[in-house]
């Protein structure tokens, strides 16, 4: 151990060390567990280059201003490696943070957790209990997989998580959580998600991360009625957080069709998903090549997706809808209420048809053959939402600007959007299940009085594979958006530039 001031110390761990050593740089410990048993508030544990085949389970907390830090030694890569660990059940993660306060993890690789059984959830990171003031920064989480090939007789499917944050205490939420500059990839999560926040979780920031090449949903902010079914419903949902500046791509069932072809959900992986949560902002993200882009939905009979804002995002080249709102068709639970979808740029989504073939839903809708879910999709029970100031740029022949499937829902406001497509075949909208190809007719049924149609927003590049969705200096979207209250529009655009310029705001994500 090397002293670092009166109140903190540095500890060193190396694969070649010995737990009988004193933990100094010259005489490092061998296991992370040995170091974590010695740390005090303010201490830092440096992991030297190499793999550590152990579960990391902190038992001591830091204090305000004295975080405990676990990190790779500068210039080296330490791996928390589950290759030789026995991983069964749920919660048996490579890194387990339970009832811990004031701790941060930096520049670690957390990898290689596998199992192939139903009802087993390999996890990279599990944060639970009453944990608070936890940071993961600059970490890579990858190759976390459940490879169970088939559904069993009980209907159990495979599950895994790169990161699972689950607030289970009704009195003390998981709080002040920061996950930033991390990378998540190569995850076989089955019917779960790569990165999940659920249950009693408040005041979280998920920013500047990259989530890609996973077989299902990338990031979900959710209620806890599934994973924490006994929780107090008044607090059993993630809330008061932000998901910003993340790059989310290739979250798709196409990654493992050998598995997903068995499921009615095949093709439904969402990049960023809000589900039964509250008061969450999703902003400045780039979401592409997912089955669906961003979702504000609910699969719950107890919890709505409510009071959320999706703004200033680039959403493009996704296989199905760009932004999805509402409950599943035929679902009679709760849905999406009092949410804002504002100042986003949607481009060339719906590269494939939808999931409905005319036989698998009560309305006998077919959005698969020569059709699509729409750049923005409203399904069941959407209430009191706002869809405004978005650039909606349709390209594929099957595309639709906005598709509202049913007559359910009420008091949704639509306005201030630009609808454009160079292809006349997709100059269409759908409202309450009926198609409209005339803009005036669309305005009459939807109440959309302030949007414009067939005006090219002049994006910098509409090259399909790598578009540049920023605006040219002559764009008609500049300075023509509707002005909303500051908490709705936010301070910055997709690039971090000032959003409102001399009381003028652009349409789309770019100011």
Model-flagged regions — what are they?
Residues 1-10:
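Bacterial Sec-dependent N-terminal signal peptides
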Residues 15-54, 442, 495, 499-500, ...:
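Acidic Gly/Asp/Thr-rich repetitive segments characteristic of extracellular carbohydrate-active
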Residues 16-20, 50-52, 74-76, 351, ...:
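Acidic glycine-/aspartate-rich tracts in secreted/extracellular proteins
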Residues 33, 37-44, 53-69, 79-106, ...:
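Extracellular beta-strand-rich solenoid/capping regions of secreted or surface-exposed proteins
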Residues 52-58, 82-85, 89-93, 114-123, ...:
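Short glycine/acidic-rich loop motifs that flank beta-strands on beta-rich extracellular proteins
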Residues 55, 59, 281-287, 302, ...:
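Predominantly extracellular beta-rich ligand-binding scaffolds that present long acidic/polar faces
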Residues 67, 73-77, 101-112, 132-145, ...:
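Right-handed parallel beta-helix
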Residues 441-511:
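C-terminal accessory segments
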């Amino acid at each position: 151990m090397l002293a670092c001031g009166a109140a903190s110390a540095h500890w060193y761990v190396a694969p070649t060390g010995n737990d009988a050593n004193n933990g100094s740089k010259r005489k490092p410990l061998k296991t992370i567990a040995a170091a974590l048993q010695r740390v005090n508030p303010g201490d830092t544990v440096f992991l030297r280059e190499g793999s550590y085949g152990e579960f990391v389970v902190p038992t001591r907390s830091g204090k305000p201003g004295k975080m405990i830090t676990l990190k790779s030694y500068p210039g080296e890569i330490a791996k928390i490696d589950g290759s030789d660990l026995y991983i069964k059940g749920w919660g048996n993660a490579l890194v387990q943070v339970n009832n811990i306060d004031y701790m941060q993890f930096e520049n670690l690789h957390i990898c290689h957790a596998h199992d192939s059984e139903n009802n087993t959830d390999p996890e990279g990171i599990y944060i639970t209990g009453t944990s608070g003031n936890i940071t993961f920064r600059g970490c890579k989480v990858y190759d976390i997989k459940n490879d169970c090939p088939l559904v069993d007789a009980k209907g159990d499917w495979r599950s895994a998580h790169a990161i699972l944050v689950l607030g289970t205490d009704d009195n003390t939420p998981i709080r002040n959580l920061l996950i930033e500059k991390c990378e998540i990839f190569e995850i076989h999560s089955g019917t779960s998600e790569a990165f999940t926040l659920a249950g009693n979780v408040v005041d979280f920031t998920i920013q500047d991360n990259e989530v890609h090449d996973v077989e299902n949903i990338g990031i979900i902010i959710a209620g806890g009625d599934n994973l924490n079914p006994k929780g107090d419903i008044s607090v059993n949902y993630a809330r008061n957080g932000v998901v910003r500046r993340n790059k989310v791509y290739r979250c798709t069932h196409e990654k493992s069709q050998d598995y997903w072809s068995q499921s009615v959900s095949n093709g439904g992986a969402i990049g960023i998903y809000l589900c039964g949560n509250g008061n969450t902002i999703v902003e400045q993200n780039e979401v592409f090549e997912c089955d669906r882009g961003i979702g504000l939905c609910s699969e719950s009979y107890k919890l709505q997706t409510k009071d959320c804002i999706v703004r200033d995002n680039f959403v493009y080249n996704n296989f199905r809808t760009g932004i999805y709102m509402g409950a599943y068709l035929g679902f009679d639970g709760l849905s999406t209420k009092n949410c804002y979808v504002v100042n986003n740029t949607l481009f060339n989504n719906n590269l494939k048809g939808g999931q409905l073939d005319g036989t698998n839903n009560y309305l006998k809708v077919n959005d698969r053959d020569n059709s699509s879910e729409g750049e923005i999709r409203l399904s069941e029970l959407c209430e009191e939402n706002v869809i405004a100031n978005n650039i909606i740029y349709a390209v594929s022949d099957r595309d639709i600007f906005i598709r509202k499937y049913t007559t359910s829902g009420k008091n949704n406001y639509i306005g201030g959007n630009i609808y454009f497509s160079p292809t006349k075949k997709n100059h269409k909208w759908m409202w309450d299940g009926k198609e409209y190809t005339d803009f005036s007719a669309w305005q009459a049924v939807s109440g959309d009085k302030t949007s414009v149609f067939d005006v090219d927003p002049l994006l910098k590049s509409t090259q399909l594979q790598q578009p540049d969705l920023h605006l040219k200096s002559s764009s008609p979207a500049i300075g023509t958006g509707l002005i909303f209250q500051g908490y709705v529009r936010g301070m910055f655009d997709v690039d971090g530039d000032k959003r409102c310029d001399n009381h003028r705001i652009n349409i789309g994500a770019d100011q």
